[in-house]
């Protein structure tokens, strides 16, 4: 019998924390801080149900799902440091709770633990080396997407197009969010992932990230991230790019002047002005429609193929999770 999403989530959480114990209580607290905050664990759930849908064992699927959740947590620690973020999952970012060098080191430790977990799974015969190769792709592509995102902000680059955003976010977020879980599901059962998984998965992952950008402007504290934090961090979101393309010249000049300032120098009143302008400009509605279109195309291509997989009950859970991924409200 296939476990329920809540049962899988509980197992993931238990395994995550279980892999991060240490006799030094301060070190353990640093390692467990982000994993202990919970979260939806969507990526880990996707890996597990994709594995079961393809015929992989529950143990192998749990092992790989735990590794992807470890990836998510160490990447978030580094991302928060690089962006100067204030909050993560409704609480202060790790580098706001501890000195930054300790937070950075904790992220490095989680990265190492991810590879250690995968090597042990390989040595125990749970999966083959192609699973580790896929994790290398995850790290490589995410790092390149982060490079583009940071470079645009640090260089003050604002003359961007929607196509620039789509290329960046395909690497930074979409691959590890939707493509890798589907590919890992096939690899865990020693099958070759179809090209469809990357083609459709990128559309779903991009739709997810666009809605993440929307929620940063329209969300509330339940969302678990600093509201309008993307504006303080100067993120080049699809919404902002569209707004700058369409705004009157005076508004655009004022917005660009604000975005050129470092976070600590951005006046709150000016950030609020830009935030309100984005909400009423039509850029948010346009971005939502783009997300809806991409999600519809991605799901429309994937579901007929997923219906052919051997694990019918797991496939049903997988399809529900993919739908929830792109219909998120928080």
Regions found by a protein language model. Give the residues of each.
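N-terminal amphipathic/basic leader segments beginning at the initiator methionine
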Residues: 1-19
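A non-catalytic, amphipathic alpha-helix used as a structural packing/dimerization or gating element
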Residues: 7, 11, 134, 171, ...
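Mg2+-dependent prenyl diphosphate-binding active-site environment of isoprenoid biosynthetic enzymes
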Residues: 17-252, 323
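Surface-exposed helix-capping loop/turn segments at secondary-structure junctions
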Residues: 124-125, 301-313
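Short, charged, amphipathic alpha-helical segments
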Residues: 129, 133, 289, 312-320
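Hydrophobic, well-ordered secondary-structure elements that form the walls
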Residues: 240, 298, 318
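Mobile late-domain/C-terminal helix-loop "cap" segments
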Residues: 253-305
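Short, amphipathic C-terminal "tail helix"
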Residues: 294, 309-330
């Amino acid at each position: 019998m296939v476990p329920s999403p809540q049962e899988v989530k509980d197992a993931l959480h238990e395994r995550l924390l279980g892999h991060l114990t240490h006799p030094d209580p301060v070190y353990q607290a640093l390692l467990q801080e982000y994993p202990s905050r919970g979260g939806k664990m969507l990526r880990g759930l996707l890996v597990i149900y994709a594995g079961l849908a393809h015929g992989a064992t529950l143990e192998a699927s749990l092992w790989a799902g735990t590794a992807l959740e470890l990836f998510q947590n160490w990447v978030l620690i580094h991302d928060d440091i690089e962006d100067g973020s204030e909050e993560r999952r409704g609480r202060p970012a790790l580098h706001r709770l501890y000195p930054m060098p300790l937070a950075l080191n904790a992220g490095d430790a989680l990265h190492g633990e991810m590879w250690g977990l995968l090597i042990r799974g390989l040595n125990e015969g749970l999966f083959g080396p192609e699973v580790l190769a896929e994790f290398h792709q995850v790290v490589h592509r995410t790092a390149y997407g982060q490079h583009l995102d940071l470079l645009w902000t640090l260089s003050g680059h604002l003359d961007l197009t929607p196509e620039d955003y789509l290329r960046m976010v395909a690497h930074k977020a979409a691959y590890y969010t939707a493509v890798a879980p589907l590919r890992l599901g096939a690899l865990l059962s020693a099958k070759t992932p179809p090209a469809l998984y990357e083609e459709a998965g990128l559309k779903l992952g991009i739709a997810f990230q666009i809605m993440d950008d929307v929620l940063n402007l329209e969300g509330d504290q339940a969302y678990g991230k600093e509201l309008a934090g993307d504006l303080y961090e100067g993120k080049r979101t699809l919404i902002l790019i569209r707004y700058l393309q369409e705004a009157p010249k005076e508004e655009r000049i004022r917005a660009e002047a604000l975005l050129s300032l470092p976070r600590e120098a951005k006046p709150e009143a000016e950030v609020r002005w830009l935030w309100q302008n984005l909400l009423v400009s039509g850029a948010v509605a346009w971005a939502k429609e783009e997300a809806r279109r991409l999600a519809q195309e991605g799901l429309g291509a994937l579901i007929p193929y997923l219906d052919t997989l051997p694990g019918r009950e797991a496939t049903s859970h997988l399809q529900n999770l993919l739908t929830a991924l792109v219909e998120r409200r928080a």
